[in-house]
Amino acid sequence: MSRALRLLPALLLACSSSGPTPTTPAPPPPAAAPAATPAPVPKASPVAAVPEASVPVPEASPAVAPRGPIELTFVGDIIFGRYRGDNTFDPIPGPDDHPFADIADTMRSDLLVGNLETPLTYDLPLKSPIGAQFRFGASKQMAAHLVDGGFTALSLANNHAFDLRAQGMIDSPVILRELGLVPLGAARTEAPLFRVETIERSGWKVGFLAVTARRNAPHFDGTPELPFASTNDFDALLSPVIAAARAQHDLIIVFVHWGEEYADDPAPHQRRAAKALLDHGADLVVGHHPHVLQGIERHGRGAVAYSLGNFLFENTNDIPRLTGVLRARFTAERCLETLTFHPAYIKRTPSKHPVPATGGMGKQVRARMTELSAPLATSFELQGENLTLGSFPCTPATAL
């Protein structure tokens, strides 16, 4: 049963409403930020959607067998500032700040993915171009912090994509590519709307499907369109895309912007949708939008993390500042071996930034994740400061 959190001050009401075959990817991200900009990661290759409503899950048969295990890490919502009530922009990191430096070791893995809850542009306007209460934006210079943080890819499919109007939707994926990062779920004018982007790393082909069930503006003809769908339509619209991409990838990860803000629990229709996506071939479903942590649920050979909460965000009040880094380790046979949740929180000084949660703060983060996962029939093992899930079945759908 959903238990709504007490809404905090005004800020807690925040969001309302491809190409050719990839080249050799960059080496893993550096040990700490700031760091030199790594070599560009490969461009993602889209896989077109198919019209069938139901497609059997085929055996995966990649062209190149994986050379060993792979680790993927995921974080929640990231912004670099917002427009205040007087319509002036208030940045989060200062010009000399390195917002991901304190948590770089925790985030380090083969692939690092987050939700970029802000559009990007080359010339950030002094005044917001829209009239909403909560308006985000960032320049290319601000987005360079993502490179220092070791990110591989960022999802753009969320309900702040229109905060800088159509120009921000156009500039965002271009800027990410210029920085050597892979945009996921970017708004586009050409079909297919829902597509799997392929990232190759260390002999693995990992497919990412990013979609949003929330948006802050309707689509107008001739303008870029977000990969938007109602959660109730996920099975019909997304499951065929996943099933079609399954044979071309070692792993399929679904990154989804959904749910209710500040809710403790996912809604029943979210749970049904997530399980359908896993049944059709997804290995993980990773959610965001509620701005708070929600529970993790096992299903078959995979799992769903309903919300990873905020990560780099201005809201440092009570529950919304609790966050974490989710690490998934897959064996060479393409089976989920362990899922580890590293507790973290948003520190207020010297500027807002995520740090590992240890001691009393770590207990607070772990308690929330444990409590909210229990009704989902999930129990963790405590390993140091972290929560771990293991013993996932390895079925023929993912075995080599």
Residue ranges: model-predicted function:
Residues 2-10:
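Sec-dependent signal peptide recognition
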Residues 12-14:
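C-terminal motif of bacterial Sec signal peptides marking the signal peptidase cleavage site
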Residues 16-30, 34-400:
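Acidic, metal/ion-coordinating pockets
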